[in-house]
UniProtKB/Swiss-Prot annotation:
Transmembrane segments: 4-24
Main location: membrane
Annotated family: Belongs to the cytochrome P450 family.
Cellular compartments annotated: Membrane
Designated name of the protein: Inactive cytochrome P450 76AD1
Gene Ontology MF annotations: heme binding; iron ion binding; monooxygenase activity; oxidoreductase activity, acting on paired donors, with incorporation or reduction of molecular oxygen
């Protein structure tokens, strides 16, 4: 059998399979939330566009705050209003609490080793307990306030030095270096980068590659039957990126565990890594779980913060009168020479409004991780079918603007907040 004949047989089988599946699914179509009519085979893929959150906000104007789409062979429900989200999270949380696993995050069994993608289970509850008690407790966050201030001061001194030398400042790189060092100091008691080195740029590119690959459209997500062949090559690239990032963490962990190391566990540094290694010794965590937990935290905690900061500065440079107003507010509240403290932020409402407006226009992430219906669930008067994926649009404020004004307000306007 030649390759052309084999390809034709596979294509006929593939089309027939999805046609039969479509016929059987038409019985429940009337119960689904409203949405645009899907095309054969590809469904509504073409209607998503390059900016899905804006596409979904526009679709919500036509079809309402709960939309059903068919992306390839996958039924997708988009939640785009606070009212629907409240019903989903407060009343229907249990049958909608598990995750739809994108094909890309199965790289290196990442979905089995991290709290983000695990189903509700004893293992997931243990991860959640460890995170709440040891990583994000008020005591832990209060304890690191001093070096948070030190890292911000370090950023200030770097920018001041560049200004004195007449050098341009790469805002994204500077913010990323600060975010990276805040996390690495909290977790490892070391700084992983320096403002004048290329290390932070390399780390940033690695994190960006991971975030980009996870967020890319993937044929294997639209047609799960293709998952085993990884048609877009995303899973392979992501596995490589995971390995590079884990290698960084493993070098730090091995140094900590080395008997002759000055930072070995016999010497208590009282950082998060010490806690994780203690849990490892007590068989509460495996080394793989520690590595992939660190991957999640450093992915989520560095790129999102630095990209938001970069957009804040971009909008202020684009709107000099707003920058001047923010500077004036800081001078009035703090005086000319006092350095800003975390406790001062509550007295800077215009600065807070700038941050909120930046997050409205340039959200670092527009969707929560996708959920999955374990069974047919009634939501907002409609049926969410079993195995449908649920996407929650974090920027549902876009929808509210459309309903109020008939269009999205894309101008930077912190004074209205």
């Amino acid at each position: 059998m030649d390759h052309a004949t084999l390809a034709m047989i596979l294509a006929i089988w593939f089309i027939s399979f999805h046609f039969i599946k479509l016929l059987f699914s038409q019985q429940t179509t009337k119960l689904l939330p409203p949405g645009p009519k899907p095309l054969p085979i590809i469904g509504n893929i073409l209607e998503v566009g390059k900016k899905p959150h804006r596409s979904f906000a526009n679709l919500a104007k036509i079809h309402g705050p709960l939309i059903s789409l068919r992306l390839g062979s996958v039924t997708t429900i988009v939640v785009s209003s606070a009212d629907v989200a409240k019903e989903m999270f407060l009343k229907k949380d249990h049958p909608l609490s598990n995750r739809t696993i994108p094909n890309s995050v199965t790289a290196g069994d990442h979905h089995k080793l991290t709290m983000s993608w695990l189903p509700v289970s004893p293992k997931w509850r243990n991860f959640r307990k460890i995170t709440a008690v040891h990583l994000l407790s008020p005591q832990r966050l209060d304890a690191c306030q001093t070096f948070r201030h030190a890292k911000v001061q370090q950023l200030y001194e770097y920018v001041q030095e560049c200004a004195q030398k007449g050098q341009a400042v790469d805002i994204g790189k500077a913010a990323f270096t600060t975010s990276l060092n805040l996390l690495s100091k909290l977790f490892f008691s070391v700084e992983l980068a320096h403002h004048k080195s290329h290390t932070s740029q390399e780390f940033k590119e690695l994190i960006w590659n991971i975030m980009e690959d996870i967020g890319k459209p993937n044929y294997a997500d639209y047609f799960p039957i293709l998952g085993c062949v990884d048609p877009s090559g995303i899973r392979r690239r992501l596995a490589c990126s995971f390995d590079k990032l884990i290698a960084v963490f493993q070098s730090i962990i091995c140094e900590r565990l080395a008997p002759d190391s000055s930072t070995a566990t016999t010497t208590t540094t009282d950082d998060v890594l010490d806690v994780l290694l203690q849990l490892f010794k007590q068989n509460e965590l495996t080394m793989g779980e520690i590595n992939h937990l660190l991957v999640d935290i450093f992915d989520a905690g560095t790129d999102t913060t630095s990209s938001t900061f970069e957009w804040v500065m971009a909008e202020l440079i684009r709107n000099p009168e707003m920058m001047e107003k923010a500077q004036e507010e800081i001078k009035q509240v703090l005086g000319k020479d006092k350095q800003i403290q975390e406790s001062d932020i509550i007295n800077l409402p215009y600065l807070q409004a700038i941050i909120k407006e930046t997050l409205r226009l340039h959200p670092p992430t527009v969707f929560l991780l996708p959920r999955k219906a374990d069974t047919d669930v009634e939501l907002y008067g409609y049926i969410v079918p079993k195995d449908a994926q649920i996407k929650y649009l974090l920027t549902y404020g876009l929808l509210e603007e459309i309903l109020m004004h008939g269009k999205m307000l894309i101008f930077f306007r912190p004074k209205d907040l």
